[in-house]
Each structure stands twice: as C-alpha cells, then as structure tokens.
Amino acid sequence: MGASENVQVMLEIFRSIERRDAQRFLDLCHSDVEFHWPPSLPYGGASRGRPGTSPTWSDTWLPLQPGETERRMDPRVVAAGDDEVVVLWRQRGINPDGDRFDGPVLGLYQVLEGKLARAQMFYFDTAALVSFLAKTRGTAET
C-alpha cells in the first residue's frame, strides 16, 4: 500500500476511536499490533497484541471523555510514507471536578498490509498529563 492508503487507514482508526467503535478499531489492527506509550503514564510502556490485564489507554481515558468535545482528537497527518504515517492529535479529558486536559500528541504509526502494526506516542507535556491523571485518581478515591 502507498502513503495515501496508509493515511486513510490511520484517519479511519482515529474516527473509530472517537466513535468508540472498538470492533472497527480492532479490524484495522494486526492481531499482534504493538503500542508504545511514555513509561510515566498509567498505561505506559510497550504492549503487543490484544489488550491484556495491564491498564490500557481506554481504561484511563474512556471515563474522562463523556462527550464529543473530550473525544474529539483532531488528527492532522504531518507526514506519510509507504509504511509509516505521522499524526499530530489532541488528547482531551475532563475529571469529575471539572478540571480539563487538552494536550498535543505526536504519533508514529506503522501500517502494513492496510492494518496498524505499530504505534508510538510522544506527548508534548507528559508532566502535565501525569499531574492531571494523578489529580483525577485522587478525585476518584475521595
């Protein structure tokens, strides 16, 4: 597949995440897809394949994204090649106290045979994100 087709795959993946269409998301991923998140995040580190017992992005963010505003990722393709796509997107959330997080993320995605094979995310301000999530966990515990 070429760059144009890979871009379409990635944009469809972002649409499936925004719509909370887990089946469509899984259909667009290789069965042994790799995800790489900053290690300081609750869902940080590397994982391969379908979700296991470790915390996932979905475990963390679905409760913090009750509406379309928080779910909107505004993906913008920055670069694309024969097997990689770079996308700038927004991570948004709101906690029970009404505190909001809205930060940019740069994702490097490998697309093979029309499916996502590897994703690595780079947050611009991981410290602010960790602080927001820690405060959110504190709110949930009280």
Where are these regions (language model features)?
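Short, mixed-charge, low-aromatic patches
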Residues: 9-19, 44-47, 64-66, 88-89
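Hydrophobic pocket/interface hotspot
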Residues: 10-13, 25, 33, 49, ...
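Poly-acidic low-complexity segments
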Residues: 21, 34, 124-125
